[in-house]
A protein has these predicted regions:
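EAL-type cyclic di-GMP phosphodiesterase domain
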Residues: 48-74, 96-146, 155-156, 175-195, ...
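Bacterial c-di-GMP phosphodiesterase EAL domain
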Residues: 2-112
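Short glycine/proline-enriched coil/turn segments at helix->beta-strand junctions
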Residues: 82-89, 111-116, 143-145, 167, ...
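Buried hydrophobic side chains on well-structured beta-strands
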Residues: 90-94, 119, 171
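EAL-family c-di-GMP phosphodiesterase catalytic domain
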Residues: 1-22, 26-28, 33-37, 46-52, ...
């Protein structure tokens, strides 16, 4: 079990019997490059040290269990629901295995009365044909929640196995694609041709960090995310 403490500036401290961690909840926009509009936000968590420094959040989240991840997701829903300034929907990160938990699914649906939140699966850590997971995904989608595959790249065999099994609403293309293929229209066209049939609403390409990459991506009907548009921000500090 975890206890939660709130502090000024949008920071949240989560405690267990033996340890605690302070998180700052951030939002990073997802754009439609053709018109420059923000379509969604992705919710991210930054780990804060006792001295107030930002630590390596990616390394931290690789060491924690599903219960903590589920707690963070529900806290993010509560946190961002306090703001009236966010008109776009928000994507929340979770492991696929967390979607086995019926009580967790029920909590998400109950908290999503505004139909503002969607689920981004950032790690496939359990068999994709798990009957309970597939049932719960359909339940979430029936309630209006999108299910998004994160960090797709051609060498991710587990992600490949999910295509055609999980009915993805969006697929996010890992930032490594742009790193090695910026300007290669044939490569991007081939990717779109192969992957698009496996998602209902389209692709989101990550890692847009330069003007050149943005100009390359905006020729296509893709959503995009990256530091070129914005770094993750604390919207409560911004306002």
């Amino acid at each position: 079990m975890f206890t939660v403490e709130y502090s000024e500036g949008g920071r949240t401290t989560i405690r267990s019997e033996r340890s605690y961690v302070t998180l700052e909840f951030l939002l990073q926009p997802i754009y439609f490059p053709k018109n420059g509009q923000t379509v969604y936000y992705e919710a991210l968590s930054s780990v804060i040290s006792d001295s107030g420094e930002h630590l390596n959040s990616e390394a931290f989240f690789e060491t924690i269990n599903d219960e903590f991840i589920k707690t963070v997701l529900l806290l993010q829903m509560e946190h961002f629901s306090q703001s009236n300034s966010i008109s776009q929907d928000i994507l929340l990160n979770v492991n696929l295995s967390s979607l086995k938990d019926d009580d967790f699914i029920e909590s998400i649906i109950k908290r999503n009365k505004s139909n503002k939140y969607h689920i981004e699966v950032n790690e496939i850590d359990t068999p994709v044909r798990d009957v309970k997971i597939l049932k719960n995904i359909k339940r979430l989608q029936k309630s209006g929640i999108y299910i998004i595959l994160d960090d797709y790249y051609h060498e991710n065999e587990i992600a490949h196995l999910s295509l055609g099994v999980i009915d993805w609403d969006y697929i996010k293309i890992d930032k490594s694609f742009l790193l090695y293929n910026s300007g290669n229209d044939d490569c991007l066209k081939a990717l779109i041709f192969v992957i698009s049939p496996y998602c209902k609403n389209g692709l989101i390409i990550e890692g847009v960090e330069t003007y050149f990459q943005n100009e390359f991506v905006k020729k296509y009907n893709l959503l995009a995310q990256g530091y070129y548009y914005s770094r993750p921000k604390n919207i409560f500090k911004e306002n």
